[in-house]
């Protein structure tokens, strides 16, 4: 796994671990701390330990990942990133992004700033962003300001703060709830009000996001389903059963109170 302090990762791990335990397997968890080299060496180490299979919650799929996957003689399942030459379980990031873009346009927003992450993370950095942009475009919003940050709340806060000193959108869309919360911190710091002055949408559906007042509009991916599917799929691969190479996880758009209807 890339980290242990992510709510999303925790949800996936807990359901996956329980499913595997219920089916007679023991889970070994290695935290790579977003370090690609550590990720690759961990795969090699697990392979040498003669484990039955490996589940990789990847932040990127590089040529090095593809090379190591090609030489393994045990199943390797990618979770969270698309792997064209093998089996992967991913969130339907494009469709989720598209629905958010469509919703923002429906609520009358035209001055929009999207704060995303690097395209190195294809799922969030490319597919989710493209979904938002196309959802807006297909519903009459031809331009959106695009900014890039990492996954930390604090960096998102600084980027949003700098942007707000030059421009004021009617809506911030954060590629994650953490990024959206960074935007909220900047909004509050400048004595602006959410959603009266600036609306806010995130992705993640963390329970904490619903305790914000007004509650955050966000996309919740079914992380528990991801965990169960990962457990089922790795067992199927170990047993030599046929599985779908690409499995999409669904989502729900939670319409909180953080988006002002500008049509009224």
Segments predicted by a language model, with ranges:
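Active-site-adjacent beta->alpha loops and helix N-cap segments on the catalytic face
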Residues: 61-72
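Short acidic active-site motifs
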Residues: 38-42, 63-65, 155, 159
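Short glycine-centered, acidic/aromatic-flanked micro-motifs in structured strand/loop junctions
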Residues: 1-3, 32, 58, 116-119
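Short beta->alpha connector loops
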Residues: 33-36, 57-62, 82-83, 178
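Bacterial carbohydrate/catabolite-sensing allosteric modules
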Residues: 14-26, 47, 71-78, 82-264
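Amphipathic helical "hinge" segments at domain boundaries
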Residues: 1-45, 49-53, 130
